[in-house]
């Protein structure tokens, strides 16, 4: 796994940032990715841990972090992309906005700077999109079952995609006028530009997920209607109510 002594000789290096004067002219992402050689060097810092806490403890998805870091180090980007998608439907999103508990759990971080895991994740998936490796995966067989997914935030989108790939007919209901939930309406463009989300939504539609916008479940559709029309209902409604701090000032 990785280069045996890389973590001793290669310091942590992250993406650089645009100059402040340039950032002030737009609201887009302002990170400048590392070169391929630098990305491979950073991936090589991943050690052959007996217990990879990044994977088993730090990552809520259980991402196969040591595996795809090693594949990046070897230059096997397509395999890395496949392993990344094995546990994560939307790595281009987590690679931009996740707070990286995996890096906080990295064993190397005990006595040194942790491996740049999120940076590797983003580089892998964007390489996958650029090379055309990420394609729609419609089901090979249909089950004939119908499923309603309520809410199009990250949980709803992932549920809809996984259910569709299993062969179920899926309807994704969203009360707003565009899909995405917090990904669209709660995260600013300098962290997550909306073309990133729209690119993945197009994949879901090509796989056969049905989008239903401006539908407020419980108001426009009753629970009785949903249970009668669908074989299953998956609630992914999120938490839209704000909790303001009642403090002066």
Report the location of each language-model feature:
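N-terminal Rossmann-like dinucleotide/flavin-binding domain of flavoprotein oxidoreductases
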Residues: 81-88, 101, 120, 182-231
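Glycine-rich nucleotide phosphate-binding loop and flanking beta-alpha elements
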Residues: 156, 219, 240-243
